[in-house]
Swiss-Prot record:
Residues 1-62 are annotated as: Disordered. PANTHER family: 50S RIBOSOMAL PROTEIN L15, LARGE RIBOSOMAL SUBUNIT PROTEIN UL15M. The gene is rplO. GO terms for biological process: translation. This is Large ribosomal subunit protein uL15.
Length: 146
């Protein structure tokens, strides 16, 4: 028998630690909490990030930047994904949702130019990148901003 051939016993279940059940259990008396102090008491302990009164790390570090409340987040669709649709179809946000290309519309849909397209399709979206616009129009398709 070698180390890598060792297997645990079948149907073996390690018994849980029963704290505070007598000295001979090994976890009696203080039950692993030490002697006195805040952590020995019920409900004791300090909140996360508390460093004993010292200025906590998250307060020592400088603040940075801000969150723009007016930021628009677009659902992104690449040109290569549009290639999966049949030629001549009109691709709208509803069609993209139904076909599960996007999970949600968010603040609109933006078509980006990754990949190639060789089908003549009409795409209706809120924004297009220059490359995406060029590729769709090169393939004979139409681009409509909604």
């Amino acid at each position: 028998m070698r180390l890598h051939e060792l297997r645990p016993k079948t149907n073996y279940k390690k018994s849980r630690k029963r704290k505070g059940r007598g000295m001979s259990s090994g976890l009696g008396k203080t039950a692993g909490r030490g002697h006195k102090g805040q952590n020995a008491r019920t409900g004791g302990g300090v909140r996360p990030g508390f460093e004993g009164g010292q200025m906590p790390l998250q307060e020592r570090l400088p603040k940075r930047g801000f969150t723009n409340a007016f930021k628009k987040e677009y659902a992104i669709v690449n040109v290569e994904t549009l290639n999966d649709f049949e030629e001549g179809t009109e691709i709208t946000p509803e069609v993209l949702l139904e076909s599960k290309v996007i999970k949600g519309v968010k603040d609109g849909i933006k078509v980006l130019g990754k990949g190639e397209i060789d089908k003549k399709i009409t795409v209706k979206a809120h924004k297009f990148s220059k490359q995406a616009k060029e590729k769709i129009e090169e393939a004979g398709g139409k681009v409509e901003v909604i």
